Swiss-Prot record:
Gene3D superfamilies: PPM-type phosphatase domain. GO terms for cellular component: plasma membrane. Its EC number is 3.1.3.16. The lineage of its organism: Eukaryota, Viridiplantae, Streptophyta, Embryophyta, Tracheophyta. One of its GO terms (molecular function) is metal ion binding. Keywords: Hydrolase, Magnesium, Manganese, Metal-binding, Protein phosphatase. This is Probable protein phosphatase 2C 5. The keyword Manganese applies. SUPFAM superfamilies: PP2C-like. Binds 2 magnesium or manganese ions per subunit. Its cofactor is Mg(2+); Mn(2+). Residues 25-297 form the PPM-type phosphatase domain. It is an enzyme of class 3 (hydrolase). PANTHER family: PROTEIN PHOSPHATASE.
């Protein structure tokens, strides 16, 4: 069973419209404050991050504001990380229908993230450069968090009560059996590096190319089975808020999710990011580029999120503390969510484009043209769209059951499914 299917089996997904309607019917819940901090140490100079807190769903309307945070851990150079940092957000937003309400915008976001990742990958590969990058891309709109990721730059969520949740899936071949099976089914090989004498060393890699990852943006010289299709997860926080820790593998190769979360509880986001990096450095030294972004989603009127670790108290002081806490909760009960847990809205990690884009055809009613679900260009389905005489439906593949794709994006889809050979020699 796939990770995404298992998740849907274990959790009851709550329709986004239900949650938003619940907010509207209850007393008005103010938008949370978003506070953040960032820290980094460079070893190769291939880590990049993105912080944008002034984005607007409706240009000129501050009430439609949302925030974006990203980590881009490059390999074989920094060009893919830089390009993705500069273009991914625009490509994602362009895939969301204009004029969408907030409800519609959030519901369209998971699909738009897939289209944006694939479009960014196609555009970068057309530049002919060979570097690649992991991507962890976080969009925060009110209490709703949407995370899309390829690679191993993890994002965790720490909420009240010390519950730490993983919002990403590591696409490391060493740890992800499902991804190993996908690559071999697509014509790639998975194995360790062979050294003199036939001995195998190091982590599992895919060949050709030698990458330890199964998903990334870029990596032009590696097999096309290294796909840019992200794992996407969308959750809604309780009104008590939560803390995100987004970091490159320079952190996660050293610290577990629980250790990282516990190490910085009670600190501001800025100090928390610095402490996480410092803890990783103290444990094993600077082995790789190390970048950490901490984001606190804080209820309106609160200066901080998580309280500092409780000190030992005598029984009488402890009783008073519990009573004050209960009284405060009762006073705020009408303002805060009755459900003090994270509610899962969406999760999907399939590497099959048809699973992620749906089956509807996006049409331009004024011109009768069809819009490519990935790159958003309008084309006529009756024309020969390719530059080399190919048809919309490749003879090398079964009929495409997803939405309309232009020739370039159709070829990319076929390549990702192993229907076109690809050679490479890049190792990282």
């Amino acid at each position: 069973m796939s990770v995404s299917k298992a998740s849907r089996t274990q959790h009851s997904l709550v329709p986004l419209a239900t949650l938003i309607g619940r907010e509207l019917r209850s007393e008005k819940v103010e938008k949370p404050f978003v506070k953040y901090g960032q820290a980094a140490l460079a070893k190769k100079g291939e880590d990049y991050f993105l912080i944008k807190t002034d984005c607007e769903r409706v240009p000129g309307d501050p009430s439609s504001a949302f925030s974006v945070f990203g980590i881009f851990d490059g390999h074989n150079g920094n060009s893919a990380a830089i390009y993705t940092k500069e273009h991914l957000l625009e490509n994602v937003v362009s895939a969301i229908p204009q004029g969408a309400s907030r409800d519609e915008w959030l519901q369209a976001l998971p699909r738009a993230l897939v289209a944006g990742f694939v479009k960014t990958d196609i555009e970068f590969q057309q530049k002919g450069e060979t570097s690649g990058t992991t991507v962890t891309f976080v969009i925060i709109d009110g209490w709703t968090i949407t995370v899309a990721s390829v690679g191993d730059s993890r994002c965790i969520l720490d909420t009240q009560g010390g519950v730490v949740s993983l919002l990403t899936v590591d696409h490391r071949l060493e740890e992800n059996v499902e991804e190993r099976e996908r690559i071999t089914a697509s014509g790639g090989e998975v194995g360790r590096l062979n050294v003199f004498g036939g001995n195998e060393v190091g982590p599992l890699r895919c060949w050709p190319g030698g990458l330890c990852l199964s998903r990334s943006i870029g990596d032009t010289d590696v097999g096309e089975f290294i796909v840019p299709i992200p794992h996407v997860k969308q959750v809604k926080l309780p009104d008590a808020g939560g803390r995100l820790i987004i970091a490159s593998d320079g952190i996660w190769d050293i610290l577990s999710s629980d250790v990282a979360a516990k190490a910085c509880r009670g600190l501001s986001a800025d100090l928390a990011a610095k402490l996480v990096v410092k803890e990783a450095l103290r444990t094993k030294g600077l082995k790789d580029d190390t970048t950490c972004v901490v984001v606190d989603i804080v209820p309106s009127g609160h200066l901080s999120l998580a309280p500092a670790p409780m000190k030992k108290q005598n029984p009488f002081t402890s009783f008073l503390s519990r009573k004050n806490h209960m009284d405060t909760n009762n006073k705020n009960g009408n303002k805060l969510s009755a459900v003090g847990v994270v509610e899962e809205l969406f999760e999907e990690g399939s590497a099959v484009l048809a699973d992620r884009l749906g089956k509807d055809l996006l049409s331009n009613t004024e011109t009768g043209l069809l819009k490519c679900a990935v790159c958003q260009i309008d084309e006529s389905p009756s024309e020969d769209l390719s530059s080399n005489g190919g048809s919309i439906i490749s003879s090398a593949s079964k009929r495409w059951e997803g939405p309309f794709l232009c020739t370039i994006c159709k070829k990319k889809k076929d390549a990702m499914e192993g229907k076109r050979p690809s050679k490479g020699s890049v190792t990282t």
